[in-house]
Regions:
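Rossmann-like adenosine-cofactor binding region
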Residues: 89-96, 208-304, 320
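N-terminal Rossmann-fold cofactor-binding loop
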Residues: 45, 66-67, 207-209, 268
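Phosphate-binding beta-alpha-beta segment of Rossmann-like dinucleotide-binding domains, i.e.
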Residues: 123, 131-179, 194, 198, ...
Length: 344
């Protein structure tokens, strides 16, 4: 108490109000963290154990069914307050309608394109995700894919293992000094930008929403429209959600604007690129190469595109690191618990 009195003397009224607000928030958070919650959780996909353990410690009953089939999900979802999914499970309107007691649909990851958000909102079901968890993992993959394209690493590896010493055929290009165009400068886009700056790349950015001013100042990013970005960049990486506005954002017209020496990287959502249009510009040499971690159909069926020598493919592994999956599971569990406690 003596300490609080001394602090009070030094503070004006506004400062005291702010201090009391902080103290009250800390006390409320401390109190809420010890409050047990009740409810049942259905985990429909494989997630890290840390999140399951957190929900159980909070008092929730957790049923873990990572291989649940659509028909079983529809018939059993009525018994649960919380539905936890990754990308495999499709939370359709049929599933939402059957979830008669659901309060939360939680996506352990970034995108929500496998959840009928509109149907959930109509039923007053909270839809949450963990976009912050995968940021570093996705960003590192993008850098890896850029280097793979620039130095033909997949081809170099495959030919060397076959006993073919094709050193003279593998003339690459450096990332240093090149222009990286970032389409969608959100959390992931900014992380990639910082990593690219460490490689001495120059940044060009496009986003329909305002880009963080501090980030622009920190990195020297040139902010421009999409067409100018495509015409100027040596590498283009895409980080936008799947929406009607972004479907086939990279169509024939926009792909034709890119330099013939440029590379396109997509780790966001498959349908932002028209794969048939991409195949044509890559096959004709109007685009140097592409790296794809996501596809219009997954697993992908466009074998012609995948088998091109100037295409690097990965099976949607952007967030597939131990650290990212552990963090996503932890973040989602904490959000679920705090919502049920009424804290958020």
């Amino acid at each position: 108490m003596a300490c609080i009195r001394r602090i009070t003397i030094l503070l004006n009224c506004n400062q005291m109000d702010n201090l009391l607000c902080v103290i009250n928030n800390i006390l409320a958070l401390k109190f809420s963290s010890s409050v047990q919650v009740s409810g049942s959780v259905l985990v429909c996909d494989s997630i890290d154990q840390v999140g399951i353990d957190s929900m159980k410690r909070a008092g929730l009953t957790v049923h873990y069914k990572p291989d649940i089939k659509p028909a079983e999900l529809v018939s059993s979802v009525k018994d649960y307050d919380v539905l936890v999914v990754r990308s495999r499970t499709k939370v359709t309107k049929e599933v939402v309608d059957a979830a008669v007691q659901a309060k939360i649909i939680a996506r352990v990851g970034v995108g929500l394109d496998n959840v009928d958000v509109q149907a959930a909102e109509m039923k007053k079901i909270r839809v949450i995700n963990a976009p912050e968890a995968a940021s570093i993992a996705v960003s590192e993959l993008v850098i890896g894919l850029m280097i793979s394209l620039a130095r033909s690493i997949p081809k170099a590896d495959a030919e060397t293992k076959r006993g073919n010493w094709i050193k003279k055929d593998l003339m690459g290009t450096q990332l240093s000094g090149k222009y990286l165009g970032i389409v969608g400068v959100g959390n992931i886009g900014r992380n990639i930008g910082r990593m690219a700056k460490a490689l001495r790349m120059n940044l060009i950015g496009y986003d329909p929403y305002p880009i963080n001013r501090e980030f622009i100042s920190e990195t020297g990013m040139i902010v421009t429209d999409l067409n100018t970005l495509l015409e100027s960049a040596d590498f283009v990486t895409c980080h936008v959600p799947a929406t009607p506005e972004t479907k086939h954002m990279f169509n024939s017209e926009r792909l034709a604007r890119m330099k013939s020496t440029a590379y396109l990287i997509n780790t966001s959502r498959g349908d932002v690129i028209d794969e048939n249009a991409l195949f044509e510009v890559l096959k004709s040499g109007k685009l140097a190469g592409a790296a794809l971690d996501v596809f219009e159909v997954e697993p992908p069926t466009n074998k012609e595109l995948m088998n091109l020598a100037n295409v690097v493919c990965t099976p949607h592994i952007g967030a597939q690191t131990k650290e990212a999956q552990e963090l996503a599971s932890r973040v989602i569990a904490e959000k679920v618990i705090q919502i049920l406690r009424g804290v958020i």
